[in-house]
């Protein structure tokens, strides 16, 4: 007794899988991108690199590449690119972007402090109260004194000593807030 498959029916082992065709050039470009990501990782300090989600083999290869020179380093970078193919690059890329943006975030925070200082000098007590709410350890009397002094310096075209001092105090408060 023979079992014959119907013409329109497929056997379970013949199921079609969706095959995504990728050109050779696209594959090479992806590999180059992974190698460039690996190069950026090699350029990082070991203390920063410790925070990245990397496999042990990749971490060891990166540490080796940091010690190598010239041609050995080039070959090691290619090896890192090969190891990166087995890794998920997204978490690594996100961690790298976070480190890159740290500088711009610090700059933005300093710009906010400068704006706060300018408002403190122009508007006076209302803004000083805002600062006191945000930083309860701040010296209200010192801020008032410096704000008045900064206005006088600006009016008489003197060097902005109090202006700078307000900023330094705000910066110290901001930096100590994170601790």
UniProtKB/Swiss-Prot annotation:
Superkingdom of the organism of origin: Bacteria
Q: State its location(s).
A: Cytoplasm
Instruction: Tell me the InterPro entries matching this sequence.
Output: DarP (IPR006839), DarP_sf (IPR023153)
The molecular function GO annotations come to: ribosome binding; rRNA binding
Which GO terms are recorded in the biological process aspect for this UniProt protein?
Answer: assembly of large subunit precursor of preribosome
Keyword terms, alphabetized:
Cytoplasm, Ribosome biogenesis, RNA-binding, rRNA-binding
Q: Which SUPFAM superfamilies did the record assign? A: PSPTO4464-like
Output the Gene Ontology cellular-component terms. Answer: cytosol
Q: Does the keyword rRNA-binding apply?
A: yes
Q: Which Pfam families does the UniProt record give?
A: DarP
**Function, as annotated:** Member of a network of 50S ribosomal subunit biogenesis factors which assembles along the 30S-50S interface, preventing incorrect 23S rRNA structures from forming. Promotes peptidyl transferase center (PTC) maturation.
Q: Which PANTHER family match?
A: UPF0307 PROTEIN YJGA
Its family remark reads: Belongs to the DarP family.
Q: What is this protein called?
A: Dual-action ribosomal maturation protein DarP
Write down the species: Aliivibrio fischeri (strain ATCC 700601 / ES114)
- Give the taxonomic lineage as stored in the record: Bacteria, Pseudomonadati, Pseudomonadota, Gammaproteobacteria, Vibrionales
Provide the gene name from the record.
darP
């Amino acid at each position: 007794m023979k079992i014959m498959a119907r013409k329109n029916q497929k056997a379970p082992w013949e199921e079609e899988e969706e095959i995504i065709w990728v050109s050779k050039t696209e594959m090479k470009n992806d590999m180059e991108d992974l190698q460039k990501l690996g190069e950026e990782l090699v350029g990082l300090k070991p203390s920063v690199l410790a925070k990245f989600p990397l496999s042990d083999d990749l971490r060891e290869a990166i540490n080796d590449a940091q010690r190598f020179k010239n041609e050995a380093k080039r070959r090691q970078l290619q090896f890192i690119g090969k190891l990166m193919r087995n890794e998920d690059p997204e978490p690594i890329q996100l961690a790298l972007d976070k480190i890159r943006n740290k500088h711009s975030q610090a700059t933005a925070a300093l710009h906010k402090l400068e704006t706060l200082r300018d408002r403190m000098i122009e508007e006076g007590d209302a803004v000083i109260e805002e600062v006191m709410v945000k930083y309860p350890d701040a010296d209200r009397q010192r801020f008032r004194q410096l704000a008045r002094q900064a206005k006088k310096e600006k009016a008489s075209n003197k060097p902005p000593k109090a202006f700078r001092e307000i900023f330094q105090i705000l910066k110290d408060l901001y930096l100590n807030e994170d601790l």
